[in-house]
Amino acid sequence: STVDAEMRYGLKYVEEQEILFGDGTGAHLEGIMPQASKYKAAFEVAMQNGIDDLRLAMLQAQLARFPATGHVLHFIDWAKIELIKDTLGRYILANPAALTGPTLWGLPVVATESSAFLGKFLTGAFSAGAQLFDREEANVVISTENADDFEKNMISIRCEERVALAVKRPEAFV
C-alpha cells in the first residue's frame, strides 16, 4: 500500500542518517562520521581537487591497514566531479552514454541527499570497519486500539525496526 511504502521509505531515510551521523545519545546510533578519522592528506597534489581528496582519503585508509571499499558523497558534490572537463571540453570521468554505476578510483560511489554531506565525503573500508546488526526488519503496524483511537474513529500507524551499529575500526573511515 501507499502508506506502507511511504513509512518504509521514511524509515530507511532516518536509518541512513543514524548510520552516518548518529550521535550515540539516548536511542540514537553512534554513527560512522562522528567516529571517522579526520582527513589528512599524506602529501600535497598540484592543483588538488575533490578527485584528489578522495584518492588521498583512500591512501589514508590504506595506511591505517584498511583498504577502502567505497565513497559516500552528496549528490551535488558527485555531480561536480562527474562534470569536470578537460581543456577540450571532454568529460574526464563521466561518459554520458555509459550505463555503468558510479565509481571513482575503482570503488563504488554512493550518492546521498543528506544535506549534512554537502561539501564533505566519507571514504572507508565499510565491510571491515563497521557492522550493522539488524535484529528486526522494518515492519508497519496499524492499530485502532491505541489509547482512545477507537472512540475518536482514528488509527495509529507505527513503522519501526531494531538495528545496532558497531564501528569496530574507526580508523577505517576518513
Spans of model-derived segments:
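Structured, hydrophobic secondary-structure cores that serve as assembly/anchoring elements
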Residues: S1-V174
